[in-house]
Amino acid sequence: MQINKESRELLEKVMTRLHNSIKNPWETQMEPYQVVPNVFYVGNKYVGSYLLKTDAGIILIDATLQETAYLLIESIRKLGFDPQKIKKLLISHGHIDHCGAARLIQEYTGCEIYFPQGDAFFLTDRRDLLLGDVPDFKVTGNYDYNSQMDFGNIRIKPVHTPGHTPGCTSFLISVDIGIEKLLLGMHGGMGLNGLSLAELEQNHLPASLQKDYEKSLKEISK
């Protein structure tokens, strides 16, 4: 996988804007909205987060940054939900913009947190790969890629899609709407940042992640 100059410049702009969201989080605010019945977008302009209203309670996918957590909580309230009733937080991968607010949310709600096993070493001996200061949080469990998580009216099938990170996880979400069933897909991390050979070598990660990324795109499309 070759990353040309134009792509690299675009990636640098994306990362600059993301880092600016830590300094000025209010600039990332956007209105929450319903994706389909019982599935809502509650993230911001740069980092996604999804709220699922299930028979088993509120499920949240990705925590966003600690600095933007107040925007996340405000978005949940705007939709008429109580953020303290979040039961489970599913984290797609171990970067600060997806798990930075995990500790805050866990302390605020008492929720369980699920985290990809392939990124578990980010939380221990390779905290530099988190790409920032992420407060410690308690991991309840890892994903079983051979089964789905059943929440009654909504079922989530985690799919291992390595590349962006070794443990990057995507979610296939099956939603019951009356007698109909909808299938939604959320890719856990399509960013090319970190995937150049120079960056992989610098981060002491295997070059095979490039091929893993290509394979993961095919896997999620099945």
Task: Name each region found by the language model.
Residues 15, 34, 56-58, 87, ...:
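A short, structure-level motif marking secondary-structure boundaries and short turns
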Residues 1-29:
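N-terminal pre-domain segments of enzymes
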Residues 39, 67-70, 77-147:
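Active-site HxH/HxHxD metal-binding segment of metal-dependent hydrolases
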Residues 14, 19-20, 29, 34-36, 58, 65-67, 148-151, 155-222, ...:
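Metallo-beta-lactamase
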Residues 2-13, 106-112, 116-120, 128, ...:
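Binuclear metal-dependent hydrolase catalytic cores
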Residues 25-79, 83, 170-192:
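Conserved beta-strand hairpin/beta-sheet module of binuclear metal-dependent hydrolase folds
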Residues 41, 59-62, 88-91, 158-160:
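Short catalytic-loop micro-motif centered on adjacent basic/acidic residues
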